Amino acid sequence: MATLGVNIDHVATIRQARRTVEPDPVAAALLAELGGADGITVHLREDRRHIQERDVRLLRQTVRTHLNLEMAATPEMVAIALDIRPDYVTLVPERREEVTTEGGLDVVSQQEPLTQVVQTLQGAGIPVSLFIDADPTQLAAAAKTTAQFIELHTGRYAEAKGEVAQQRELAILADGVQQAKALGLRVNAGHGLTYSNVGAIARLEGIEELNIGHTIISRAVLVGMVQAVRDMKALISP
C-alpha cells in the first residue's frame, strides 16, 4: 500500500490571503505528522504565492518524516534546494497565471536542461522526482534523465466524468506505473485526489507515495488537521 505525503501549501494560502503570520504551515506539518502523515510536501513557487522560503527552512529543521520540495527547474530554485537540502525534490512545470499545476512536465522537449538539474541535485545527494503524465514517451524520457522517481499526474483521473471515463484514466495510470517500474523508476502519484476518489489509485500496485493536499486542508478546516490526515490514511492504508 502507498504511503501518504501531505501537501500543506494551502495552509500558507490562507495565511497569505491576509499577509499575516497565521496559520503557520510549520505547525500544520507537525499536526499532519501527528495524524500519521508519512511525509510533508510543499511547493515553493517562483511567485511565492503561498509557501515562503522561510517556511521551507523551518520545515527542514522540524519535519520528522521526510520533506519533499516541489519546485520549477530554475537556477534560483536549484540553488535554494542545494542550500536547504530537502529529503527529495519533485520538479514540476510552473506558469504564473495557473491556479494550480495543470499538467506534467514535458520531459521530451526539455530533456537536456532537466537532465542537468537532475544530475546537479542527485550529485549533491538529493533524490529527484519528475512530475509527469502517464505517457509512454514522457516516461521513457524521464528515465533518460537518471531521476530516481517520477510522480504520475492523477489530475485527468480526478477530473474524469462518469465511470467509463474514470476507469479509462485509471487504466492509463496503471500502465504508466508498470512501464515506469520496468524502466527502473520509483513511482509516486498525486494531483486532484480526494477522499472520494483516492481508493482506486491507492490500490494500484507499485505506487510508493500519494501526495495529497487541497482535500485534506479543506477537511481540516472542519475537523482539524490530525483527524483529516487520519481519515485519509484510513482510506489509502486500510
UniProtKB/Swiss-Prot annotation:
InterPro entries assigned to the protein according to its UniProt record, in alphabetical order: Aldolase_TIM, PyrdxlP_synth_PdxJ, Pyridoxine-5'_phos_synth
One Pfam family in the UniProt entry: PdxJ
Subcellular location: Cytoplasm
GO biological process: pyridoxine biosynthetic process
Self-association and partners: Homooctamer; tetramer of dimers.
One Gene Ontology cellular component annotation held by this UniProt entry: cytosol
Bridged cysteine pairs (disulfide): none
Keywords: Cytoplasm, Pyridoxine biosynthesis, Transferase
Broad enzyme group: transferase
Similarity comment text for this entry: Belongs to the PNP synthase family.
Residues noted as binding 3-amino-2-oxopropyl phosphate in the record, renumbered to the chain: 7, 18, 192, 213-214
Name listed for the protein in its UniProt record: Pyridoxine 5'-phosphate synthase
Record carries keyword Membrane: no
Annotated metabolic or biological route of this protein: Cofactor biosynthesis; pyridoxine 5'-phosphate biosynthesis; pyridoxine 5'-phosphate from D-erythrose 4-phosphate: step 5/5
Job of this protein: Catalyzes the complicated ring closure reaction between the two acyclic compounds 1-deoxy-D-xylulose-5-phosphate (DXP) and 3-amino-2-oxopropyl phosphate (1-amino-acetone-3-phosphate or AAP) to form pyridoxine 5'-phosphate (PNP) and inorganic phosphate.
Catalytic activity, reaction form: 3-amino-2-oxopropyl phosphate + 1-deoxy-D-xylulose 5-phosphate = pyridoxine 5'-phosphate + phosphate + 2 H2O + H(+)
Residues the record marks as active site: 43 (proton acceptor), 70 (proton acceptor), 191 (proton donor)
